[in-house]
């Protein structure tokens, strides 16, 4: 069974330490994945102000965020401008590409996207994407062919802005099948490959799921009859939970699960009927995420 492995790289620390760790692990298992990089300023520490929201505070406590992410991530860009990841760590990003992994754009400024994208019009969104697109193109020596928005924060304006780039596909939402997004009654050409499985921070500490049984729980969610797309984070599975993720990958292999870049799924799975992207709340995540409108059977 082939399953898409999407690796989101949100921060300077995740790029510097998590990406090389994950590349080494995947090479040892003869697997490749899709890495989506944030390449602009690392201002993730500015999310600390969200601690004033009870749901976000509970999530931070439930996942033991300080030990999970590290204080350098939690404070980065809070009191001073964060480093531009793509300029400081271009060799790390390029090394993932040279190792045969698919490399796509996550964001220019990950924090700014999550915090302000809803207030941006299409041109402002295009400008944000263009900054990241241009820097990543320079690093890779060619334009990136795919993208994935931070935090599954997407909108019709985002989809229209992305349609102005030569992306083969985007992965901007949660769902259950590959589809063409509908905007203002029209089907866009760029397909969406949605994430079908929950992330570590959405399930650990809930419903009896702990680090001790997390791998078994996640493996139980894979369905050979359906599209399977898993998102991990370089900051989590690539650093704090690296050993646990290595055990997960080896257990998945023993069950016949082979992780592949998302682009492979375009060839393996037919695109279903077109669908709109809508905002929904899902268990374990604070606030809304973008979801495939007809995805009634999502695993959360």
Give residue ranges: language-model regions:
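Catalytic alpha-helical scaffold of carbohydrate-active enzymes acting on polysaccharides/glycoconjugates
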Residues: 1-146, 151-191, 209-230, 237-300
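Positively charged, amphipathic and often flexible ligand-engagement surfaces
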Residues: 192-206
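Active-site clefts of carbohydrate-active enzymes
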Residues: 200, 232-235
């Amino acid at each position: 069974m082939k399953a898409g492995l999407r690796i989101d790289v949100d921060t300077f620390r995740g790029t510097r330490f998590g990406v090389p760790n994950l590349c080494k692990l995947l090479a040892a298992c003869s697997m490749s994945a899709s890495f989506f990089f944030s390449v602009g300023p690392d201002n993730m520490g500015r999310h600390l102000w969200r601690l004033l929201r009870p749901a976000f505070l509970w999530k931070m406590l439930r996942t033991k965020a300080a030990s999970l992410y590290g204080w350098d991530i939690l404070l980065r860009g809070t009191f001073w401008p964060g480093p531009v990841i793509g300029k400081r760590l271009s060799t790390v990003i390029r090394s993932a590409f040279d190792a045969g992994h698919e490399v796509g754009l996550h964001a220019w400024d990950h924090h700014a996207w999550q915090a302000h994208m809803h207030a941006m019009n299409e041109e402002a969104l295009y400008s944000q994407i263009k900054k990241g697109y241009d820097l990543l193109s320079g690093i890779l020596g060619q334009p990136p062919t795919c993208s994935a928005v931070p935090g599954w924060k997407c909108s019709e304006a985002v989809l229209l802005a992305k349609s102005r780039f030569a992306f083969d596909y985007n992965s901007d939402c949660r769902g259950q099948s590959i589809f063409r997004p509908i905007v203002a009654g029209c089907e866009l050409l760029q397909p969406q490959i949605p994430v079908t499985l929950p992330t570590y921070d959405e399930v650990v500490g809930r419903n009896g799921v702990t680090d001790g049984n997390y791998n078994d729980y996640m493996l139980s969610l894979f369905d050979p009859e359906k599209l399977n797309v898993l998102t991990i984070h370089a900051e989590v599975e690539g650093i704090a939970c690296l050993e646990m993720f290595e055990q997960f990958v080896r257990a998945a292999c023993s069950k016949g699960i082979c992780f592949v870049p998302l682009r492979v799924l375009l060839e393996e799975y037919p695109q279903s009927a077109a669908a709109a992207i809508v905002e929904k709340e899902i268990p374990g995540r604070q606030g809304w995420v973008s979801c495939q409108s007809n995805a009634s059977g999502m695993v959360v």
